[in-house]
Regions:
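Core register positions within helices of long alpha-helical scaffolds
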Residues: 107, 138-141, 169
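Primarily the internal scaffold of c-type cytochrome electron-transfer domains
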Residues: 1-102, 106, 111, 158-161
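Amphipathic alpha-helical scaffolding segments comprising HEAT/armadillo-like alpha-solenoid repeats
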Residues: 81-91, 113-125, 143-155, 171
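Extended hydrophobic/aromatic segments used for targeting, binding, or gating
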Residues: 123, 127-142
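Secondary-structure transition/capping motifs at alpha-helix termini
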Residues: 11-13, 142-145
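Leucine-rich solenoid repeat scaffolds
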Residues: 163, 167-170
């Protein structure tokens, strides 16, 4: 389990640390994005194309139904306009982990437009406090009157952390 789902990276020659994200490795995506590839730990003698083909053969359909988080974040960090739609897809997918959805909302702040406004409004009402806080932080980019209209209901949020962030953003 550890080799695939918690691969170790050694820092400063003597400090191995395991990745605690517990994600399913995706060698094809890793090769496309230049990301670390957990499969390479055991199959160092094989190339990325072989690993991607073997993964697809062993686990057919794995990961096909979800939007590629890595691709969406890569587009965002490169400042490409198509990131807006990709980030909204990540943020709006209910089965995406809340930390990833919150990160997508934060990144969406760099691409705000009328197209992404509904995603931001939905994030302000999301069941996850992480997503609500991320949406509040994105509101900081708006003029105070728009900020107030969107964020004021969160001053009564049941969670103190959300209320505190709302107070900070709306002050």
């Amino acid at each position: 389990c550890l080799a695939c789902h918690m691969p170790a990276t050694t820092y400063m020659v003597i400090d191995p640390r395991r990745d605690h994200s517990l994600r399913v490795p995706h060698p094809g995506q890793a090769a496309a994005l230049g990301a670390p590839n957990a499969c390479g730990g055991c199959h160092a003698d094989r190339d990325a194309a072989w690993m991607a083909a073997a993964f697809a053969r062993l686990f057919p359909g794995a990961g096909e139904s979800r939007t590629s988080w890595g691709r969406a974040f890569e587009l965002a960090r490169a400042g490409l306009p198509q990131a807006e739609v990709a980030l909204m897809a990540v943020a709006n997918r209910a089965e995406t982990p809340e930390l990833v959805r919150a990160t997508a909302i934060l990144e969406l702040g760099g691409f705000l437009s009328p197209l992404s406004a509904p995603a931001l409004r939905a994030a302000l009402a999301d069941p996850s406090p992480l997503v609500r806080i991320a949406a509040l932080r994105v509101l900081e980019q708006l003029p105070i009157e728009n900020r107030w209209l969107a964020g004021e209901p969160l001053l009564a949020d049941p969670l103190l952390a959300v209320r505190a962030e709302a107070g900070r953003v709306l002050a």
